[in-house]
Structures are given as C-alpha cells and as structure tokens.
Amino acid sequence: MNIIKKGFLMNEEIREKEVRVIAEDGEQLGVIPTSEALKRAEEKELDLVMIAPTGKPPVCKIMNYGKFIYEQTKKDKEAKKKQKVINVKEIRLSATIEEHDIGIKANNARKFLKAEDKVKVTVRFRGREMEHSNVVGNKILKTFLSKVEDVCVVEKPARLEGKNMTMVLAPRK
C-alpha cells in the first residue's frame, strides 16, 4: 500500500506480543496475541492499526487504514475551516489630519470591521506636536470613533505609547 503515514503503527510494524483488539464494528475482541490479531485482519482484508500505543497492553483496531486516514484528513480540514483567523489592520493618522480625511480613513476602518478584522488606529506625533499630544490625539481618536462606533466596540482605549497614541477597535458581534 502506498499510503501516507500519520504516526500510527500498522500490521507487521507492531512489535508487541499481545494487544487489545477492537473489531471494525467497534466490538471488543479482548487481549489477544499480535499474530492472531494480524490473521483476523488479513482474513477480512483490512489492516491492524495501533491507535493507543501507551495503553497496557496497546490498543489496536482492525480497519481500512486508507479510509481511516482519509476520514482523519477530512476532519482536520473541517476543523481548519471553522477556525477564523483574526487580523489586526492598522490605520495611521497624523496630528494635523483634516475632518474629511478622517472620514475617508473611517470608511476604510468600517470595511475592515465588517470583514471581522480588528483595527488599530494610530495617531503619530512629530517634533513639537508632542507638546499637546494628549489633547490633540484624544480629539482625533474621538472624532474617528464617532464615525465608526455603530460597527465596533473599543477593545483597548486611547493610550499614549512613545510618539504614538493608539486605540484598538473590534467588530461588534
């Protein structure tokens, strides 16, 4: 058989003397010698797969290994589809930004939030702009927030970090 290995020992690779065997229909066959378990699997043209090597004795199941791997891969893909990757998009504003430009940036943020992404809004201060950074930064971020507050919640409120004032917005559920 040319099947990709997923970390399971099967058939002749099983080196234990005795194993606990489960039939393909889920019935417990009990603890039997590995050679007998292999014979039973071969009679049914199936594989003996060790599914729990840490058990005493190890647990093996008689099954179609190719079908088993296919089902496992299918389950993994389904689980991966259900996971949602949350991206953090950054929108940068300057301390001297005009009202209209804030509106345009807010529309971009609205698109990101509707796509279930978080938005980090950053106001950058340069040179002398730092003298009034708290007042100016809070005013700009409040204006920005007023334009998008219907589609978001504030995850992290406005905070001064060095030469930047940042705020993180998350989509409304």
Swiss-Prot record:
Q: Where on the tree of life does the source sit, at the highest rank?
A: Bacteria
Instruction: State if Transferase is listed as a keyword.
Output: no
Q: Which residues form a coiled coil?
A: none
InterPro entries listed in its UniProt record: T_IF-3_C_sf, T_IF-3_N_sf, Translation_initiation_fac3_CS, Translation_initiation_fac_3, Translation_initiation_fac_3_C, Translation_initiation_fac_3_N
Renumbered to this chain, the signal peptide range is none
Q: Which GO terms describe its cellular component?
A: cytosol; membrane
- Entry keyword Cytoplasm: yes
- Output the GO biological process annotations, alphabetical, semicolon-separated: ribosome disassembly
Q: What is its main location?
A: cytoplasm
Task: Name one matching Pfam family.
Answer: IF3_C
Keyword terms: Cytoplasm, Initiation factor, Protein biosynthesis
The listed locations are: Cytoplasm
GO MF terms here are: ribosome binding; translation initiation factor activity
Similarity section: Belongs to the IF-3 family.
Task: Return the NCBIfam families for the record.
Answer: infC (TIGR00168)
Q: Which PANTHER family match?
A: TRANSLATION INITIATION FACTOR IF-3 (PTHR10938), TRANSLATION INITIATION FACTOR IF-3, MITOCHONDRIAL (PTHR10938:SF0)
Tell me, what does this protein do in biology? IF-3 binds to the 30S ribosomal subunit and shifts the equilibrium between 70S ribosomes and their 50S and 30S subunits in favor of the free subunits, thus enhancing the availability of 30S subunits on which protein synthesis initiation begins.
Q: How does it assemble?
A: Monomer.
Among HAMAP family, the record links this protein to: IF_3
Protein's recorded name = Translation initiation factor IF-3
Q: Species name for this entry?
A: Clostridium tetani (strain Massachusetts / E88)
The primary gene name is infC
